[in-house]
């Protein structure tokens, strides 16, 4: 539908309108032209490292990701140390009830966040998606803050994950120095990223398959153990049930304990939004993204909520092995490993430790991918040095990738006596950072819908709509704010058994992400000095993807006669 047919007018550029024409043009559904040489396209020869030259209207990044890649990134991409290891510390602080409820609340939030992101990513599949949406639909300065916050988040996560990899290996061999393992895994991450988006996609596909299969195996075994089907020489040889929900209790340390689990839940879900970032490098986002977005429901429900429910049934929250203070670093504190150990299942603890190792390595690869693409998008908008706009012939943003990888060397600091201090500060930077990204996605979706209506469009012109609509985004934004408030409360009043909060240093270790985001926003505003975007000045046309409306309308016609309950299932699951 043309602009004249739809009856809307693109807002004129004024003082508070950002020009996106330079970086986001209408994208053809078949994607950009690609180099004829297969080795060049996949970064396998010297020529692939040369700068790529673009014709008018071409996008900057290659789009090699297929539907299977997006589906597995959505369903298993962010399952890592926060879920497998950090959940142990959360259980120790808040008890099984808080663990279950807090992850459920964050899961509801993420359900709405990912659907809102999916709607925007299908409409505007651009590099650095959520940063671009914040700058485009909310405020350029806020977009600057969200972009650099996201880059910093992943820059902090990479050395964290490398450190966890080294410590995880020590479960089997403590004689070889951790530095050797950090070097090995950093090398693996570099090699995978040399293959660009396709390397990331393939690694995530197979790593996610492994993580999800392992989690399913764990839940089947856990179900048997809860019913008392464990080995005779183990703990769970009699009916176990929900005894730990009664003694020592479902909710530990009261309201403080309940609030303290939120930060672990947020850290565990970090990376879920990468499926939106990957849309810019997907062969056909319109066709592939909806199915990938719908996978998030199953991951939240089955793998996070149900998996941690079994953890709460089988592991005592007072177990001394749950090292709250080192819960993100030491796989020995993983409740998944402890279940196998206490059950007397020979080799199961080693299997779960291997799963943890694969998971944290996967998150490290994701960190380089997500951070580098966002940094490139920032540079394209003039919010980062021009050097980072460089894209080679295989679609790799090489300077941005190198920039992120350099942060991996911080992991070697963990070998020093001051290592734990550095680890705490890295965790402080990354722990809550994702909440600001998720809240911004919801707010950008709300603002987009408002501007879409203002400029004369209807909801029928949106090919994929968020399941909860704009109300789901309001709910997601509300939960983000509540979680940030809850974490502020625990930062000034820590639950019993947690490191004390009596100094400014202790407070900022709990809440550093907030002043960091505020600082980025101030810098962005001082740099561009552009006011908050008003609805009439939000441009909803530039960069809008072309759609095959015959195919979309045919699908809608097929679904329309179905009963209401079947239509809900189709749109949601």
UniProtKB/Swiss-Prot annotation:
Keywords: Amino-acid transport, Membrane, Transmembrane, Transmembrane helix, Transport. Gene3D superfamilies: Amino acid/polyamine transporter I. The keyword Transport applies. GO terms for cellular component: membrane. Its main location: membrane. One of its GO terms (molecular function) is amino acid transmembrane transporter activity. It is a multi-pass membrane protein. The chain crosses the membrane at residues 72-92, 99-117, 176-200, 212-229, 257-280, 296-315, 351-371, 398-415, 425-444, 470-494, 511-527. Induction: During mycoparasitism. It is found in: Membrane. The keyword Manganese does not apply. InterPro entries: AA-permease/SLC12A_dom, Amino_acid_permease_CS, APC_YAT. It comes from the Eukaryota. Belongs to the amino acid-polyamine-organocation (APC) superfamily. This is Amino-acid permease inda1. It comes from Hypocrea atroviridis.
């Amino acid at each position: 539908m043309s602009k004249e047919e739809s009856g809307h007018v693109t807002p004129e550029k004024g003082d508070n309108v950002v020009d996106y024409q330079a970086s986001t043009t209408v994208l053809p559904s078949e994607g950009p032209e690609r180099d004829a040489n297969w080795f060049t396209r996949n970064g396998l020869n010297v020529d692939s490292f040369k700068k790529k030259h673009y014709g008018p209207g071409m996008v900057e990044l290659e789009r090699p990701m297929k539907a299977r890649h997006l589906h597995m990134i959505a369903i298993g991409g962010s399952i890592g140390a926060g879920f497998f290891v950090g959940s142990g510390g959360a259980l120790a602080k808040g008890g099984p009830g808080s663990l279950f409820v807090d992850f459920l609340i964050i899961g509801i939030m993420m359900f709405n966040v990912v659907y809102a992101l999916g709607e925007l990513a299908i409409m505007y599949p651009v590099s650095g998606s959520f940063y671009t949406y914040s700058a485009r639909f909310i405020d350029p300065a806020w977009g600057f803050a969200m972009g650099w916050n996201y880059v910093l988040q992943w820059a902090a996560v990479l050395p964290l994950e490398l450190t966890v990899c080294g410590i995880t290996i020590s479960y089997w061999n403590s004689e070889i120095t951790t530095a050797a393992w950090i070097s090995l895994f950093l090398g693996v991450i570099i090699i995978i990223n040399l293959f660009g988006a396709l390397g990331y996609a393939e690694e995530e596909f197979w790593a996610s398959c492994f993580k999800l299969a392992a989690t399913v195996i764990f839940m089947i075994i856990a179900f048997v153990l809860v019913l008392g089907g464990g080995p005779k020489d183990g703990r769970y040889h009699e009916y176990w049930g929900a005894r730990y929900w009664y003694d020592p209790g479902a909710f530990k340390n009261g309201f403080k304990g309940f609030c303290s689990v939120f930060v672990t839940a947020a850290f565990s879900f970090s990376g879920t939004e990468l499926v939106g970032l990957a849309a810019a490098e997907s062969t056909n986002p319109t066709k592939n993204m909806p199915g990938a977005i719908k996978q998030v429901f199953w991951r939240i429900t089955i793998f996070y909520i149900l998996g941690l429910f079994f953890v709460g049934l089988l592991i005592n929250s007072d177990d001394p092995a749950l090292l709250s203070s080192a819960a993100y670093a030491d796989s020995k504190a993983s409740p998944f490993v402890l279940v196998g150990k206490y059950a007397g299942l020979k080799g199961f603890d080693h299997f779960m430790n291997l799963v943890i190792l694969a998971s944290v390595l996967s998150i490290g690869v994701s960190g380089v991918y997500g951070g580098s693409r966002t940094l490139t998008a920032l540079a394209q908008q003039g919010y980062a040095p021009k050097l980072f706009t460089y894209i080679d012939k295989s679609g790799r943003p090489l300077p941005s990738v190198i920039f992120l990888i350099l942060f991996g060397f911080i992991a070697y600091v963990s070998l020093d006596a001051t290592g734990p201090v550095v680890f705490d500060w890295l965790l402080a930077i990354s722990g809550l950072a994702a909440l600001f990204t998720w809240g911004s996605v919801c707010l950008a979706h709300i603002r987009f819908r408002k501007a879409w209506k203002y400029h004369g469009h209807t909801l029928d012109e949106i090919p994929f709509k968020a399941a909860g609509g704009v109300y789901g985004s309001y709910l997601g934004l509300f939960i983000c704010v509540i979680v940030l408030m809850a974490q502020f409360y625990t930062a000034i009043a820590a639950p019993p058994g947690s490191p004390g909060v009596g100094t400014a240093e202790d407070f900022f270790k709990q809440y550093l992400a907030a002043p960091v985001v505020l600082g980025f926003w101030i810098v962005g505003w001082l740099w561009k000095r552009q006011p908050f975007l008003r609805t009439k000045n939000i441009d909803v046309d530039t960069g809008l993807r072309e759609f095959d409306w015959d195919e979309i309308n045919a699908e809608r016609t097929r679904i329309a006669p179905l009963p209401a309950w079947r239509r809900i299932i189709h749109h949601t699951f």
